[in-house]
Amino acid sequence: MDAVDTTMEKLRAQCLSRGASGIQGVARFFRRLDQDGSRSLDVRELQRGLAELGLVLDTAEMEGVCRRWDRDGSGTLDLEEFLRALRPPMSQAREAVVTAAFAKLDRSGDGVVTVDDLRGVYSGRTHPKVRSGEWTEEQVLRHFLDNFDSSEKDGQVTLAEFQDYYSGVSASMDTDEEFVAMMTSAWRL
C-alpha cells in the first residue's frame, strides 16, 4: 500500500465514521462543488471541500491524491474516479447483487432509474403518508428516489449513485452472505 492508498483509507474511515450514508454524503457534496459540470476538481476545490466537510488531509496527502486522479495532467482530479476509489471496496458478490438490484429498477434499460421505472417495482399505495392523504403516490416514489439521488435531486439515479449508497451499507455488514441476503430480500431478486 502506497501513501495515496493510505490517505484514501484515512479519508474512507473519516467518511464511514459519519454512518452508512457517509460516502454518499461526500459524493453529493463534491458533485455539487463541481459547478461547471466538468466532473473534475482542482487541488484548491478539493481542499476547500474536504475542510468544509471536516475531513482532514495535510498538504502532501492532498497533492498525492490530486496527482493520482489527474488523468490528463491538467491539474484537476477526475471526480468520479476519486469517488469510486473512496467507496469502501465491495467483493464481487456484493457488487453483483447491487448491480442486479439496479438493473431490476432500471426497467427502461437506459442506465438511470426514474419514477417511471419505479412504478412497476415499488408501490407507494400503502405508505402511511399516502394513506393519510398527506402525499400522493408520486411524492412517495420521488422521496424514495431521493434517498439514492445526488444533491441535485433530479429524479434520476445512476448506478454510481446507487453504488455510493450501498457501499456505505455494505461497510456495516460483516459477511457477503448477510449483505447478499439483505439485498435479495429488499429487492426481491
Curated annotation (Swiss-Prot):
Modified residues annotated as Phosphoserine in this record: 40
Domain EF-hand: 21-56, 57-92, 93-128, 136-172
SMART domains: EFh
Subcellular location: Cytoplasm
UniProt: Ca(2+) 1 binding residues: 34, 36, 38, 40, 45
Cellular component GO terms, alphabetical: cytoplasm
Pfam families given in the database record: EF-hand_7
GO function terms (MF aspect): calcium ion binding
Residues annotated for Ca(2+) 2 binding in this entry: 70, 72, 74, 76, 81
Residues holding Ca(2+) 3: 106, 108, 110, 117
Keywords: Calcium, Cytoplasm, Metal-binding, Phosphoprotein, Repeat
Taxonomic superkingdom: Eukaryota
InterPro entries: Ca-bind_SignalingProt, EF-hand-dom_pair, EF_Hand_1_Ca_BS, EF_hand_dom
UniProt cross-references to PANTHER family, sorted A to Z: CALCYPHOSIN
Function: Calcium-binding protein. May play a role in cellular signaling events (Potential).
Quaternary structure annotation from Swiss-Prot or TrEMBL: Monomer. Does not form oligomers in the presence of calcium.
UniProt-recorded name of the protein: Calcyphosin
